Amino acid sequence: FGETSGETKGMWFGPRL
């Protein structure tokens, strides 16, 4: 995930949603 942001640490559901 993390298509919007390069952070797949825990914001993979944050920036998108």
From Swiss-Prot:
One of its GO terms (biological process) is neuropeptide signaling pathway. GO terms for molecular function: neuropeptide hormone activity. The modification Leucine amide is found at residue 17. Keywords: Amidation, Neuropeptide, Secreted. It is found in: Secreted. One of its GO terms (cellular component) is extracellular region. Expressed in abdominal perisympathetic organs and abdominal ganglia. InterPro entries: Pyrokinin_CS. Belongs to the pyrokinin family. Myoactive. This is Pyrokinin-5.
